[in-house]
């Protein structure tokens, strides 16, 4: 008889620690420096999600500036920097300064990992709000994150005459999505182009969008008429705790992209895009000409996105089933064009053949997003 060696959930996982807060905490988890290990930070990410926190994981090899930009654009309550490479005294003050430079010196920095006891005082003196050494329990970390939350104010505090544009946009988006009161003078305008990218989980949507943004920003450097671009990436919210793991930034090299595009991750339940139209207007009002909207992609019902965007790209991959199965899903009806991603995988020819039966005059574009293949052609089609 089979035995259960481990329960599917634990008491820690089921406990929503954030229900009584003004809003669910938004925490940016990042690894600075050359440290290539992320198992520990992934454990923390899951624990935070299972506590009701919205966790943005930026991945390995981040610079202080890339983390600061991410925290600003995501309107984070706290940055949690994991350090394992003995560079905390060097990178810590650089991160604190970078937050000042990007207009969010008020975001506290928590640092954890291999931190010698003799360095803790120095870290606090340079502006690190909390330090967590090896052996700190997940309960203590979760409680510290909960304690970091403060009610959102409509206008970002700034030492200058006006807050940084991206910082203020991030706050406007947060308040809109959470049902709060946005400043009355927030500029609003629909971007020139609003492009939806949808498809099933694992189809490579995040990688595809990151490649599209890279190609777009390269073109915009030589053609100012394109303007700037932004991304809204939606991920599912836990039906049990209300937490979320927002991992779309993992696919983006922000060390190169920097401030050339605005990226924002948001968590929703099901297809609840109730705040999307208002957010789109805020993005356009902030001066972004093109907006890519990446959907949750949770299954057959991801169709409502078409109500909010100008063009919809449906991403498919080999092995998803024959034409009847794809037609049954209903999602093919909303496509303005089809993207056959992972075109180097077995079954690609069969996928394209089956799609031709339902595509009509709609374009079918083959891509290998991880290698950048087909991305220029896809962007041409989306901008046409």
Regions found by a protein language model. Name each.
Residues 30, 198-201:
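Residues at the beta-strand->loop junction immediately N-terminal to the Walker
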Residues 122-138, 142-144, 334-383:
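Canonical P-loop GTPase G-domain recognition
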Residues 35, 200-203:
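ATP-binding Walker
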Residues 34, 41-143:
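Cofactor-cradling patches in redox/metallo enzymes
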Residues 299-362:
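Conserved C-terminal guanine-recognition region of P-loop GTPase G domains, centered on the G4
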Residues 136, 169, 173-192, 203, ...:
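Nucleotide-state-sensitive switch-loop elements of NTP-binding domains
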Residues 163-174, 369, 377-384:
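Long, well-ordered amphipathic alpha-helical subdomains in the mid-to-C-terminal portions
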Residues 2-14, 131, 139-194:
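Extreme N-terminal, non-catalytic leader segments
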